[in-house]
Amino acid sequence: MVVYLTHWFRQEDRGKAVAMFMAAIPVSNAIGAPVAGLLLRLHWLGISGWRWLLILEGVPALLGGVVALFYLTDRPKEARWLTGEEKDWISGELGKEKGKTHGHGDMLAALRQPFVWALALAYFLINTSGYGLNIWLPKMVQKFAGLTTFEVSLVVAIPFAVSVPAMLLAGWHSDKTGERRWHAALAAITAGLGLALSQLVNGNPVLIIASFSIAAVGIMSFYPTYWAMATGLLSARSAAAGFGFVNLIANFGGFVGPYMVGYLTDRTGTYAAGVYSLVATALLSAVVLIAMRHRKPAAVGVALNPDVLVP
C-alpha cells in the first residue's frame, strides 16, 4: 500500500498521506475494541458471540476490498474522478521526482544497499514493541484493574484513540520541516519511554493507562515519518522489491514481540520483564535510525534523492 501511495503523492506530501492512511490502524483499534466487547456478548440464532464477531467484522472488510478493487486505479491518469487538469498536475509533479532516479532497480540491487537492511531492522524492532503491546495490553489491563471483558475493551481503546491526532501531527510536521529520520527516531524513543514509565508508576491504573497512551503515541507516530523517509530512499522501480523485503523482515516482529512478552512473563511471573523487553526494542529502533548518516548514493537504481541516509 505504501508503494501505491507513492504513485499518487509527492515526496513532500507523503508524511501526511501515510499518516492519514495508517491512522486507520489506531482508529480501528479504538472503535473495534469496544465493538468487539459488545459482539462477544451476543448469542443470536444459536450462534455464539465470538462467531458473530468474525462475521460482523469480517464482512465489511471484504466489501471494502471489493469497492477498492473497482473504484481505485493504479495511476492518477486512469482515475475517472479526477479532472484532466488534476491528472496532468499530479503526473507532472511525480514525473519530476522520477527524473532524479538513477539506473535500474530490482530486488538484488535493493538488497545490496546497507540502508535497506537498516530500514528493515528499525521497522522490525518497532514492530516487535508495537505488536507486543497490542497483543498483551488487554491482559495487562485486566490484571491490574480487575475489569470485565467489556470494560477492558473500553480502557484498551484509550491509548489508540489518543495516538490518532499525534500520528497526524507527526506526519504534518515531518512534511512541513522536510525532516524524516529524527521524527521517526524520536517517536521510537517516546514509545520506549512510555513503556518504561508504565512499570514505574507503582501500579496506579490511571498512570499506567497514561503511560501506555504515551507508548502508543510513539509507536503510531513512527509509521508515517518512517515510511515518508523510506519512500524517499528507493526509486519507483526498486520500491516494490525494497519495501517487500522491509515488510518481510518487519513482520517477524509480530511474532517475536508477543512471544517474547509471554515467555518472560511465564519465566518471571510478572509482566515487567516482558514490557522492559519492548522498551529495549523500541529504543534500539531509534538507535538504528540515529546511526544512519548522509552519503552520496551509488548509481544502482535505489536512490531517489541526491542525498540519502545509509548506515
Which residues make up each language-model segment?
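Intracellular juxtamembrane helix-capping segments at the cytosolic ends
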Residues: 1-9, 221-234
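Helix-to-loop junctions at the C-terminal end of transmembrane segments
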Residues: 40, 166-179, 265-266
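Extracytoplasmic gate region of multi-pass secondary transporters
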Residues: 108-171, 223, 227, 257-258
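Symmetry-related core transmembrane helices of the 12-TM Major Facilitator Superfamily/SLC fold
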Residues: 51-70, 275-290
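Glycine-rich segments within core transmembrane alpha-helices of 12-TM secondary carriers
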Residues: 15-38, 44, 60-61, 247-257
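C-terminal transmembrane helical hairpin of 12-TM major facilitator-type secondary transporters
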Residues: 180-229
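A late C-terminal transmembrane helix in Major Facilitator Superfamily
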Residues: 231-270, 278
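Cytoplasmic helix-loop-helix junction between adjacent transmembrane helices
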Residues: 1-23
